[in-house]
């Protein structure tokens, strides 16, 4: 191989690149428009090789931030190679002076691009740093009309980079296929030749390797697909042939990101590539799925597993998730899937071996597993999750007249048929609407989404990336006694509560929380913990069945800037569920937020987040950007002004719940012998009375706490100090500011010019409490010591 050997990104770098693309609001199509007249990259020709400097400009326009130097360099090298020598007998750099012109020779250009985008699967991946002088030498390649030269500068073809990045984006597979077709159809004749098709497939194999696919099995599938596309055998593929062939190749659809929203319940499988932790057999050919990486395809709805080569055969359809018509007295039947059930038979209680693929099967709905000879009744009741699950017999389409009255205007404008459903749950059950934010907790949300698709009816599980909470709430609009499970952070919970308010339910559905990511102060107060750590989801669903209800106060946050000041940042929320703060803690949160937006790869764990908070808190201690806060704000509680002149504060927090900064209680605990439950909602500002005031998230009262500085915050966070300074307990708060100050609401910070802020009660939302924490021996000893 020549000097221009493929440079592979490490798995960590690939994950890092994916996180950057998730944070970006731009699409590849948006960035390509920058090469047109009036764009920021108009001086460069996208059809010619580009330099490292132009590559960085392109990536910055796409990701909206600068990539770290090592990642940027390795990604550039992943698409570049030095111009090859004409004579293979001269492998030495710079030995030949006659280098082919990459922009004049179409065949040689294709060969170079093919070499640049074809990974060397036989050789060990190398990680190389591009020397600064070599990158400087590459600059002429990025000039608008720079001719090709014999320089040793690396060459990057923009279309290869664009094709690669488009595969990582979310979107419909058919749109990605059409985009890649037009990207490589440089002569715009609506045809692709064999060399252009090979370049596209090479990029697909490149991305597939990073996703831990086995290219030795995928490559022949893609080659067979290309051969089948050319129906008239003329060596060219039209757009129609390309899209129709791609849409019928299941492994390719999985690679492109199969859209499962349209296949919920119509009998089509939703495939995902999977690495099986235990021996698993193909449900079609009954041969074990082999491989050290991802071994085969598995349906996320029914767990039907097949080889990639077997998926195109006539395999049984997926489970139906609804009934075609309402039938009185209809009994739900088991939906069987054979094999791969290494558990005990639910009748004879004898172990079922994984290789007994034809002698045992399990029901998709109730999870009962039997030997064939042990099967009992064919009726299915939903199993241990029957209180949550919507069986197919509980869902059926409504009449066409009603559907026409409720059809979605957007879909109707496109000529699409929008099917509406009626839900009649089984008596005594409480169907669960699951709303999952796939972006919460890194990739944790995506895994949770797939697990719930299997545990429950896929129709009752919704991806918040696809339309937000509204589609799920509309689906359950007339369903009695349903519950909601919000899977995400505190921001996701607030988003769902806002949409529930707008849905105008006759009865507000109770909401449980499965916390993902970091922080999760509301979930902590509701006893659901600080973050999901991979436990049994079935256990969590069983806990929701027994959950008691508590009412959560929600508050209006009205920010009214002064007319004479310039506009500041946009206020994140106008509803407060957890807390509002101004001053030192908001300053730290704002710096943390800005840094995370710029470098998301540095904030991928809870420990790293805590270290960053410690660093920003330490620097804030010395900077003291919010000192003498009392000179710049006025505080009123229930219309009574609070005197701050004799109190040296750097921050003020308005609390609705007893948790902030990921579990810190700024108000502090109130001793039981002093605790007084207040019947009136008059403002309390007397220090002696405040010692007896109890904090409660459903008392329609706010707690106002003062912070002396970043040092005090650190002491409270680490437990060296019990709480901040209690200033008031009241039912409304008004704050007037006189200068630009950092603020935050429910963990979302912003910079606010002088303004007036009013916080008033909005309503109460029913929330579900988690199970009480089990007391350990050490916690009991601590309690006994505190009593003494």
From Swiss-Prot:
UniProt EC number: 2.7.1.107
Pathway field of the UniProt record reads: Lipid metabolism; glycerolipid metabolism
What cellular component terms from Gene Ontology apply here?
cytoskeleton; cytosol; membrane; plasma membrane
Give yes or no: UniProt keyword Ribosomal protein: no
Q: Where is the DAGKc domain?
A: 427-561
Compositional bias (Polar residues) spans?
A: 95-109
Q: How is its activity regulated?
A: The activity is calcium-dependent. Requires phosphatidylserine for maximal activity.
Instruction: Write down the superkingdom of origin.
Output: Eukaryota
Please indicate if the UniProt record lists Flavoprotein as a keyword. no
Q: Which GO terms describe its molecular function?
A: ATP binding; ATP-dependent diacylglycerol kinase activity; calcium ion binding; lipid binding; zinc ion binding
Q: What class of enzyme is it?
A: transferase
- What does it catalyze? a 1,2-diacyl-sn-glycerol + ATP = a 1,2-diacyl-sn-glycero-3-phosphate + ADP + H(+); 1,2-didecanoyl-sn-glycerol + ATP = 1,2-didecanoyl-sn-glycero-3-phosphate + ADP + H(+); 1,2-di-(9Z-octadecenoyl)-sn-glycerol + ATP = 1,2-di-(9Z-octadecenoyl)-sn-glycero-3-phosphate + ADP + H(+); 1-octadecanoyl-2-(9Z,12Z)-octadecadienoyl-sn-glycerol + ATP = 1-octadecanoyl-2-(9Z,12Z-octadecadienoyl)-sn-glycero-3-phosphate + ADP + H(+)
Q: Which stretches of sequence are listed as region Disordered? A: 83-150, 768-788
- Subcellular localization(s) per the UniProt record: Membrane; Cytoplasm, Cytosol; Cytoplasm, Cytoskeleton
Instruction: Tell me, in one coarse class, where this protein mainly resides.
Output: membrane
Zn finger residue spans: Phorbol-ester/DAG-type: 268-318, 333-380
- The UniProt annotation places Ca(2+) 2 binding at 230, 232, 234, 241
Q: What does UniProt note about where in the body, tissue by tissue, this protein is expressed? A: Expressed specifically in brain. Highly expressed in cerebellar Purkinje cells (at protein level).
| Biased composition annotated in UniProt, kind: Basic and acidic residues | 83-93
Question: What Pfam families does the database record attribute to this sequence?
Answer: C1_1, DAG_kinase_N, DAGK_acc, DAGK_cat
The UniProt keywords, alphabetically, are: ATP-binding, Calcium, Cytoplasm, Cytoskeleton, Kinase, Lipid metabolism, Membrane, Metal-binding, Nucleotide-binding, Repeat, Transferase, Zinc, Zinc-finger
Q: What does this protein do?
A: Diacylglycerol kinase that converts diacylglycerol/DAG into phosphatidic acid/phosphatidate/PA and regulates the respective levels of these two bioactive lipids. Thereby, acts as a central switch between the signaling pathways activated by these second messengers with different cellular targets and opposite effects in numerous biological processes. Has no apparent specificity with regard to the acyl compositions of diacylglycerol. Specifically expressed in the cerebellum where it controls the level of diacylglycerol which in turn regulates the activity of protein kinase C gamma.
Q: What family is it from?
A: Belongs to the eukaryotic diacylglycerol kinase family.
Put simply, this protein is called Diacylglycerol kinase gamma
| Organism expressing this protein natively | Rattus norvegicus
């Amino acid at each position: 191989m020549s000097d221009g050997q493929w440079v592979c990104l490490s798995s960590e770098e690939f994950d890092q690149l994916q996180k950057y693309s998730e944070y970006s609001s731009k699409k590849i199509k948006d960035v390509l428009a920058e090469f047109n007249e009036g764009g920021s990259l108009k001086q460069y020709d996208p059809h010619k090789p580009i330099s490292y400097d132009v590559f960085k400009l392109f990536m910055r326009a796409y990701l909206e931030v600068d990539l770290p130097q090592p990642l940027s360099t390795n990604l550039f090298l992943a698409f570049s190679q030095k111009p090859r020598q004409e004579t293979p007998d001269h492998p030495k750099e710079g030995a030949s002076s006659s280098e082919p012109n990459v922009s004049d020779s179409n065949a040689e250009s294709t060969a170079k691009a093919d070499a640049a985008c074809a990974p060397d699967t036989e050789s060990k991946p190398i990680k190389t740093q591009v020397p600064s002088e070599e990158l400087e030498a590459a600059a002429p390649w990025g000039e608008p009309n720079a001719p090709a030269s014999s320089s040793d500068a690396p060459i990057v073809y923009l279309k290869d980079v664009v094709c690669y990045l488009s595969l990582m984006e979310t979107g419909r597979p058919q749109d990605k296929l059409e985009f890649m077709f037009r990207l490589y159809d440089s002569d715009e004749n609506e045809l692709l030749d064999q060399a252009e098709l090979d370049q596209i497939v090479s990029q697909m194999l490149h991305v597939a390797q990073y996703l831990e696919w086995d290219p030795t099995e995928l490559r022949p599938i893609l080659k067979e697909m290309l051969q089948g596309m050319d129906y008239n055998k003329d060596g060219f593929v039209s757009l129609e042939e390309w899209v129709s062939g791609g849409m019928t190749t299941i492994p390719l659809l999985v690679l492109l990101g199969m859209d499962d929203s349209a296949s919920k319940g119509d009998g089509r499988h939703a495939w995902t590539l999977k690495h099986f932790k235990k021996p698993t057999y193909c449900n079609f050919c009954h041969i074990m799925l082999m491989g050290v990486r991802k071994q085969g395809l598995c349906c996320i709805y029914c767990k039907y597993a097949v080889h990639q080569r077997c998926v195109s055969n006539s395999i049984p359809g997926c489970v139906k998730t609804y009934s075609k018509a309402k039938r009185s007295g209809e009994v739900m039947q088991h939906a069987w899937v054979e094999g791969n059930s290494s558990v005990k038979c639910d009748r004879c209680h004898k172990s079922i071996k994984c290789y007994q693929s034809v002698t045992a099967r399990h029901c998709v709905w109730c999870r009962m597993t039997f030997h064939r000879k042990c099967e009992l009744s064919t009726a299915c009741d939903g199993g241990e999750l029957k209180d949550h699950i919507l069986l197919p017999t509980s869902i059926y389409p409504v009449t066409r007249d009603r559907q026409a009255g409720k059809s979605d205007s957007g879909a109707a404008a496109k000529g699409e048929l929008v099917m509406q459903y009626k839900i009649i749950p089984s008596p005594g059950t409480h169907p669960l609407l699951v709303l999952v934010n796939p972006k919460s907790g890194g990739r944790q949300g995506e895994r949770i989404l797939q697990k719930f698709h299997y545990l429950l009816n896929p129709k009752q599980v919704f991806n918040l990336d696809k339309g937000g909470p509204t589609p799920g709430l509309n689906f359950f609009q007339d369903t009695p006694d349903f519950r909601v499970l919000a899977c995400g952070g505190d921001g996701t919970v607030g988003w769902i509560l806002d949409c529930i308010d707008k849905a105008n339910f006759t009865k507000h559905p109770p909401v449980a929380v499965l916390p993902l990511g970091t922080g999760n102060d509301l979930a902590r107060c509701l006893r659901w913990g600080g973050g999901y750590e991979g436990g049994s989801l079935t256990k969590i669903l069983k806990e929701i069945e027994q959950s008691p209800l508590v009412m959560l106060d929600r508050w209006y946050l009205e920010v009214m800037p002064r007319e004479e000041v310039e506009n500041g940042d946009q206020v994140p929320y106008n509803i407060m569920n957890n807390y509002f703060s101004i001053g030192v803690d908001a300053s730290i949160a704002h710096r943390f937020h800005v840094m995370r937006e710029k470098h998301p790869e540095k904030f991928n764990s809870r420990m790293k987040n805590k270290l960053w908070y410690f660093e920003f808190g330490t620097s804030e201690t010395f900077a003291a950007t919010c000192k003498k806060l009392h000179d710049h704000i006025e505080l009123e509680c229930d219309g009574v002004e609070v005197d701050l002149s004799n109190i040296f504060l750097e921050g003020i927090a308005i609390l609705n719940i007893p948790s902030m900064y990921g579990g810190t209680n700024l108000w502090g605990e109130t001793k039981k012998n002093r605790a007084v439950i207040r019947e009136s909602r008059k403002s309390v500002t007397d220090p002696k009375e405040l010692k007896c005031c109890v904090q409660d998230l459903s008392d329609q009262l706010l707690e106002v706490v003062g912070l002396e500085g970043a040092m005090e915050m650190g002491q409270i966070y680490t437990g060296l100090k019990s709480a901040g300074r209690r200033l008031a307990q009241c039912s409304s708060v008004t704050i007037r500011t006189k200068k630009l100050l950092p603020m935050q609401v429910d963990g979302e910070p912003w910079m606010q010019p002088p303004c007036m802020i009013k916080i008033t009660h909005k309503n109460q939302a029913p929330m579900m409490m988690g199970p009480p924490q089990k007391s350990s021996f050490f916690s009991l000893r601590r309690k006994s010591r505190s009593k003494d």
